[in-house]
Amino acid sequence: MPRVVIFLSWLTADRLLVEGRAWKLGGIKPSSTVQSVKAFIQASTRMPISQQRLIFAGRQLENPITLAEYNITHNSVLNCVIRLVGGKPAIYLLSPQAINKVSVSVELSREWDFAVIYPLADKSQNSKFSTSKVTWNVSVDSTGILREASGREYSYLFWEAETQPATPMIDDEMYNRFNAARPILTSSNSVVLPFHDFIGYLEMTLERLQLTVSMRTDFMTYWMPNFLHIRDQGLDIAVTFVEQSMFNKAARLSITPQPSTVARVFMLFGAVDTTDRDENDSEWRNLRLDLKEANDIDWAMRIGLDVKGLKDQRAFRAMEWGGMEVYDV
């Protein structure tokens, strides 16, 4: 049976993921399913199957169908559109006394849409500039436990979102807000560390950003499989945090009554090759940061987080954390 070589051009939203480069997949047969091609891509690039959309001749390919059924032949070119995921933004409400009625809403910009919401809530479209909005109505007690009208109790409000097909943007929008479909993780805005230094550094950074022990534990356990996968590839980890004012324009958080302090900690991270090999021509070459230099960075100041306000246990406060792995670094 003839074997097929497929050249994939990688796209994130509307731009090439790697300029001028295509992944060449060998060992693919006409009888191979779309699912098996995605599995090969996942093994080669770490991109989860669930976040891949394969496009051929303007048509999205379905997992169970074979390449032959789509008339994909030798040297065919597929586009792989990546769905980036904003992982587990969790909203905590902290109050010294019970508040009977609290309304919490999140409204997303057009670049992404809700994939998971918990507690369950109805989505609504709020404006032409937004994909959707969700609102929760809860009470909060002095221990931070949230209660719905049904009496069910929760530790936090949870939402997760996936990026959508690209939409036109004007320059002002692009440079003044976080764009979930085009997250920016560069050598100039991030810290690069090997895994064995990174984990302790991240734990310390989260503590400085005023996440409680419970929040830090949830954060680390949620992202640890991704960090371990990067380590197992022999790569280092680049990390940055999104400025709060920019993130607010991509995911507007509204809380009534208004807390005295609202903190939104959203991490971007990705795998990078910092080795000094001749074939490594990336911007990350030799860019591992000394741990002492990394420890000197004041992330709270960089992202505009009010540390003093968060420490005031006499006040009503809100804390949200989340993150996103960036694959085109």
Model regions and ranges:
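Ubiquitin system architectures
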Residues: M1-G87
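Protease-labile, long low-complexity intrinsically disordered regions enriched in Pro/Ser/Thr
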Residues: V85-V329
